[in-house]
C-alpha cells in the first residue's frame, strides 16, 4: 500500500511540477514606503506550440493570440492586486486600471505590446506612477477569447500537459531599479482562465513580495 502511495505522490509531483525563484532588493522596504501608485503593463506573451500544432494557425493568428493573452493577464493581475487592496494587505495606495494604462500609452503613440525602447522612468513619467510591473510570459495553453478551446479543437492538444513560464519585474520608476523579480515555471494545471492562472502563479509567494503583507 505504501508503495502505491509513493508512486501516486511521485506522479502527482511530476504532473504539477513548478519552479519558483524570487529576488527582492536589499532596500525593498524603503522602496515600498516611497511607492504610492503602480501600473501593470501587458506582458510580452509568447504562445509556444509544437511544430505539428503550428500548422493550424497563421503567424498573425499566433501574434494576436499572444496579444489577447497579454491583456487578459494584465486584467487578471489588476484584479489580484485590487483584491489585496480591499483586504488591506496591499501596501500601495493606488493601482492604475489597465484600461487607463493602455489608453495613456496609446495616446502617447506607444504600442502596448512593444515598449522596450522606453526606460521604466520614462514609462513611469508618462503613466504617472511610482512602480511598473512588466515582464514575459510563455505558455502552451492560451486562455483568452476562447483561444484555449480553439487550440484544443484545431490542434488536438486538449489532453496535453500544460506548461507556463512567467518572469515578472517590479521596477521603481524614479531610478529604474529592479525591486522584485519573480520567476515561476509550471508544468501541470493552469486553471480554466487567466484569473485562475494568476492565482496559481502568485500562490505561496504573495506574502514574500514586499508590496503585500
Feature roles, as predicted:
Residues 120-122, 152-157:
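Short, P/G- and charge-enriched loop/turn segments at secondary-structure junctions
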Residues 1-21:
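Bacterial Sec-dependent N-terminal signal peptides
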Residues 44-46, 50-134, 173-184, 204, ...:
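N-terminal segment of the mature soluble domain
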Residues 7, 15, 151-154, 211:
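Short, aromatic- and cysteine-enriched interfacial helices/patches
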Residues 55, 147-153:
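"Short basic amphipathic alpha-helical interaction patches in structured regions
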Residues 19-49, 85, 126, 137-148, ...:
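C-terminal/domain-edge helix-coil "capping" segments
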Residues 3, 97, 137-140:
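Histidine- and/or cysteine-centered catalytic micro-motif in compact active-site loops
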Amino acid at each position: 500500500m505504501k508503495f502505491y502511495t509513493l508512486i501516486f505522490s511521485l506522479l502527482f509531483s511530476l504532473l504539477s511540477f513548478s519552479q519558483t525563484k524570487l529576488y527582492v532588493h536589499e532596500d525593498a522596504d524603503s522602496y515600498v514606503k516611497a511607492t504610492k501608485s503602480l501600473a501593470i503593463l501587458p506582458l510580452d506573451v509568447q504562445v509556444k506550440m509544437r511544430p505539428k500544432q503550428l500548422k493550424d494557425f497563421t503567424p498573425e493568428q499566433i501574434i494576436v493570440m499572444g496579444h489577447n493573452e497579454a491583456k487578459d493577464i494584465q486584467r487578471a493581475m489588476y484584479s489580484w492586486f485590487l483584491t489585496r487592496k480591499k483586504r488591506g494587505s496591499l501596501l500601495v495606495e493606488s493601482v492604475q486600471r489597465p484600461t487607463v494604462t493602455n489608453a495613456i500609452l496609446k495616446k502617447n503613440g506607444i504600442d502596448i505590446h512593444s515598449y522596450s525602447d522606453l526606460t521604466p522612468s520614462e514609462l513611469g513619467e508618462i503613466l504617472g506612477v511610482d512602480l511598473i510591473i512588466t515582464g514575459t510570459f510563455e505558455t502552451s495553453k492560451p486562455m483568452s477569447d476562447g483561444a484555449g478551446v480553439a487550440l484544443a479543437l484545431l490542434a488536438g492538444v486538449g489532453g496535453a500537459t500544460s506548461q507556463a513560464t512567467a518572469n515578472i519585474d517590479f521596477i521603481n520608476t524614479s531610478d529604474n531599479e529592479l525591486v522584485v523579480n519573480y520567476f515561476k515555471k509550471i508544468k501541470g494545471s493552469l486553471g480554466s482562465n487567466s484569473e485562475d492562472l494568476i492565482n496559481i502563479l502568485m500562490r505561496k509567494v504573495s506574502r514574500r513580495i514586499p508590496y503585500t503583507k
